């Protein structure tokens, strides 16, 4: 009987995602033994420093890939929004699972709507993407960095350190914290991050479990997320850049929305593509080129300094 080892971060959300993948695999392959290999990553160790200042979200990924390289694990489970624009040589994204609610949520103990927040309200978020869009929509808000897992952030809110938080709906739903969601922010206000709400499974290209993992792939989610990633690849963006890209499918038609700007919200570029499904990758490239024509490279250059 084969044993498949899943490398995962130790946070409650990461463990939930790894367990979810394990359950899906067991449904498809009842004879398979699945074990979790929890790993502390640099992103977890540096839990109080904004990601944009310490090298971006790849800090959540690197140690999991090392575990696979050293044969301490067979696959790794990630939040797709944490996965960098390129994978190390010899690794593949074998599956992307069905997307949970991809939008951002307002979480507050006193206010039910973003528009109800008073001038100068303290809003916790560490995401440059969220800061860009919130500052553009409500420049009066005081946007404050917050790190830590979902429960840690909720505790900080409950202690009175913040008037509201902006968190991913998907994480709250998966951790059964749905009741904390006061408002789901529409795309007009806060366009989601690339891959937000989707779980990805990475493995070595020569893994004996590659075919097992590929059975979990959800085509519609995968094509949307991969198209979002094309935009970022063409722009050569990463976690340290305020960028939002979101693709949706309606039948065989894809709508691809994108934004890039400055975290003060004073400059925000946007572009939308509507295309046939088979044209998705080209649409991603066109989207990136349109943003570049508007001046995206100037913004990217500022954040790479």
Curated annotation (Swiss-Prot):
Residues that span the membrane, as ranges: none
Q: What is its EC number?
A: 2.5.1.61
Name the Pfam families on file.
Porphobil_deam, Porphobil_deamC
InterPro entries attached here? HemC (IPR000860), Porphobilin_deaminase_cofac_BS (IPR022419), Porphobilin_deaminase_N (IPR022417), Porphobilinogen_deaminase_C (IPR022418), Porphobilinogen_deaminase_C_sf (IPR036803)
Question: Carries keyword Iron?
Answer: no
Alphabetical GO biological process terms: protoporphyrinogen IX biosynthetic process
**What is the uppermost EC class here?**
transferase
| Pathway annotation | Porphyrin-containing compound metabolism; protoporphyrin-IX biosynthesis; coproporphyrinogen-III from 5-aminolevulinate: step 2/4
| Catalytic reactions of this protein | 4 porphobilinogen + H2O = hydroxymethylbilane + 4 NH4(+)
Q: Does the keyword S-adenosyl-L-methionine apply?
A: no
Record's cofactor remark: Binds 1 dipyrromethane group covalently.
**Which GO-annotated molecular functions does the record name?**
hydroxymethylbilane synthase activity
**Which SUPFAM superfamilies does this chain map to?**
Periplasmic binding protein-like II, Porphobilinogen deaminase (hydroxymethylbilane synthase), C-terminal domain
Which top-level group of life is the source organism from?
Answer: Bacteria
| Sequence positions bearing S-(dipyrrolylmethanemethyl)cysteine | 239
GO CC annotation, single: cytoplasm
Could you say which cofactors this protein requires?
dipyrromethane
Q: Which UniProt keywords apply?
A: Porphyrin biosynthesis, Transferase
- Write out the similarity annotation: Belongs to the HMBS family.
What the protein does comes down to: Tetrapolymerization of the monopyrrole PBG into the hydroxymethylbilane pre-uroporphyrinogen in several discrete steps.
User: What does the further note read?
Assistant: The porphobilinogen subunits are added to the dipyrromethane group.
> Which PANTHER family does the annotation name?
PORPHOBILINOGEN DEAMINASE (PTHR11557:SF0)
Q: How is this protein organized at the quaternary level?
A: Monomer.
Q: What is this protein called?
A: Porphobilinogen deaminase
- The protein's organism comes out as Dichelobacter nodosus (strain VCS1703A)
Gene encoding it?
Answer: hemC
């Amino acid at each position: 009987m084969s044993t498949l080892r899943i490398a995962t971060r130790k946070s409650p959300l990461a463990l939930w995602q790894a367990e979810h993948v394990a359950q899906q695999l067991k449904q498809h392959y009842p004879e398979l033994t699945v074990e979790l290999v929890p790993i502390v990553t640099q992103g977890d160790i540096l839990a109080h420093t904004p990601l944009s200042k310490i090298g971006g979200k790849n800090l959540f990924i690197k140690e999991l890939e090392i575990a696979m390289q050293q044969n301490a694990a067979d696959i790794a489970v990630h939040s797709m929004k944490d996965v960098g624009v390129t994978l190390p040589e010899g690794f593949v994204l074998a599956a992307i699972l069905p997307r949970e609610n991809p939008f951002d949520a307002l979480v507050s103990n006193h206010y039910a709507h973003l528009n109800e927040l008073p001038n100068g309200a303290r809003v916790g978020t560490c995401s440059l993407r969220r800061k860009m869009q919130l500052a553009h929509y409500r420049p009066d808000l005081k946007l404050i960095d917050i790190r830590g897992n979902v429960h840690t952030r909720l505790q900080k809110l409950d202690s009175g350190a913040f008037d509201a938080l902006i968190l991913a709906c998907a994480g709250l739903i998966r951790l059964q914290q749905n009741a904390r969601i006061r408002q789901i922010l529409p795309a007009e206000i806060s366009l989601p991050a690339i891959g937000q709400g989707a779980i990805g499974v990475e493995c070595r290209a020569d893994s004996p479990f590659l075919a097992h993992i590929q059975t979990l792939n959800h085509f519609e989610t995968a094509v949307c997320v991969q198209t979002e990633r094309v935009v970022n690849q063409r722009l050569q963006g990463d976690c340290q850049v305020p960028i939002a890209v979101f693709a949706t499918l309606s039948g065989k038609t894809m709508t691809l929305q994108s934004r890039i700007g400055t975290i003060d919200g004073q400059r925000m570029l946007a572009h939308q593509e509507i295309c046939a499904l088979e044209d998705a990758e080209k649409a991603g490239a066109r989207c990136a080129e349109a943003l570049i024509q508007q001046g995206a490279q100037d913004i990217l250059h500022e954040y790479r300094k």
